[in-house]
């Protein structure tokens, strides 16, 4: 949520107003500028104006909706909310020959300032590799890496091929503010739905989660995850969340899950959304000219839906409801009509059907093919 900037409560208390009020209380004296009475009161009026300005600052910093980052962090701490720190990206590295042990070796990415250290072995020739720099920059680079001085001379090739757990930057001020106010809406406690949402989000690399209670009988809970970048969670991230929340699955509360709960963690599935439509172009335009912008707009729409995925779990006085995401034909058409050169749209279909596309609660939309 955005920071609220209130109007100053004491903005009218200027030097001139304060001084005039002071002068009005003095009668039958020389009160002209430069006189002793005027000079002595003017100094006090300046200080009083500064006090009023400080009072405005105190009011702004006292409330969660208007506080700046420093004071919002202090306010949120009273609710047990601590800003998420920046984290390290974890990637899959593949090395040849496959029998060489590269555990603990350090590498760098050419033409960047990024360095990496090899950690856990996944299989022969494949390892988890941690970017040594904090923050999201480590999410953006794949490709060949080179050993830093002292590398194993047997290494022939080294390559980062997949982002396993995305890094995140230090939590933004507005994200902290949103979590602060969310803490008043539904209390996270005792393994309720909000509790699972909070405990999953506190694990590095995680994004939205959908919580399905009693999905396989009493005491069972299903957690369906996305990663921090709103993509399906990798098997490594799924395993990490499972290990932290319920490593044994025996209802005994060994992890963070309460006693009596058996938690299963899975990644969301992908549903490719193929769009077919008939476009009419303004003279001087054709499909090749507008295709990049159309693709960008449709990718952005799919991302908006993925970002709203967890919000489809609704807890209301009527109960708990898990609603599907719906890809709207009307949304697609309205966005396409905003592209310069497109003047009409007809016969839009989603995955071959001329209707809105409903996506099951355990899946997320990804843009497939666009055809005209």
Question: Can you annotate each of these PLM segments?
Answer:
Residues 185-325:
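Carbohydrate-recognition loop of C-type lectin domains
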Residues 1-201, 258, 286-372:
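N-terminal polar alpha-helical/low-complexity "assembly arms" that mediate subunit docking
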């Amino acid at each position: 949520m955005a920071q609220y900037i209130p109007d100053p409560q004491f903005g009218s208390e200027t030097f001139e107003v304060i001084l005039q009020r002071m002068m009005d209380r003095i009668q039958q004296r020389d009160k002209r500028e430069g006189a002793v009475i005027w000079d002595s009161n003017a100094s006090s009026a300046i200080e009083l104006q500064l006090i009023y300005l400080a009072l405005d600052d105190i009011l702004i910093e006292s409330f969660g909706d208007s506080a700046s980052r420093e004071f919002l962090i202090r306010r949120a701490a009273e609710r047990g909310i601590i800003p998420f720190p920046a984290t390290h990206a974890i990637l899959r590295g593949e090395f040849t020959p496959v029998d060489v042990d590269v555990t603990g070796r350090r590498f760098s990415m050419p033409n960047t300032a990024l360095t990496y250290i090899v950690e856990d072995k996944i299989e022969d020739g494949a390892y988890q590799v941690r970017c040594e720099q904090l923050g999201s920059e480590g999410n953006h680079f794949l490709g060949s890496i080179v050993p830093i001085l002292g590398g194993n001379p047997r290494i022939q090739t080294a390559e980062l091929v997949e982002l396993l757990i995305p890094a995140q930057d230090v939590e933004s001020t507005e994200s902290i503010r949103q979590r602060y106010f969310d803490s008043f809406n539904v209390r996270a406690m005792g393994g309720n739905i909000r509790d699972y949402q909070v405990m999953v989000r506190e694990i590095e690399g995680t994004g939205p989660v959908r919580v399905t209670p009693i999905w396989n009988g009493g005491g069972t809970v299903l957690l369906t995850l996305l990663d921090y970048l709103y993509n399906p969670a990798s098997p490594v991230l799924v395993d990490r969340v499972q290990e932290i929340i319920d490593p044994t699955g025996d209802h005994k509360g060994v992890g963070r899950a309460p006693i009596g709960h058996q938690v299963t963690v899975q990644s969301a599935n992908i549903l490719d959304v193929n769009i077919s439509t008939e476009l009419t172009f303004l003279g001087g335009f054709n499909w090749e000219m507008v295709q990049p912008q159309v693709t960008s707009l449709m990718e952005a729409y799919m991302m908006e839906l993925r970002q709203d995925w967890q919000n489809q779990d609704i807890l209301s006085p009527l109960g708990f409801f898990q609603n599907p995401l719906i890809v709207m034909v009307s949304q697609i058409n309205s966005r396409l009509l905003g592209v310069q050169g497109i003047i009409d749209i007809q016969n839009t279909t989603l995955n071959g059907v001329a209707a809105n596309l409903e996506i099951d609660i355990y899946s997320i939309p990804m843009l497939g093919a666009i055809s005209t």
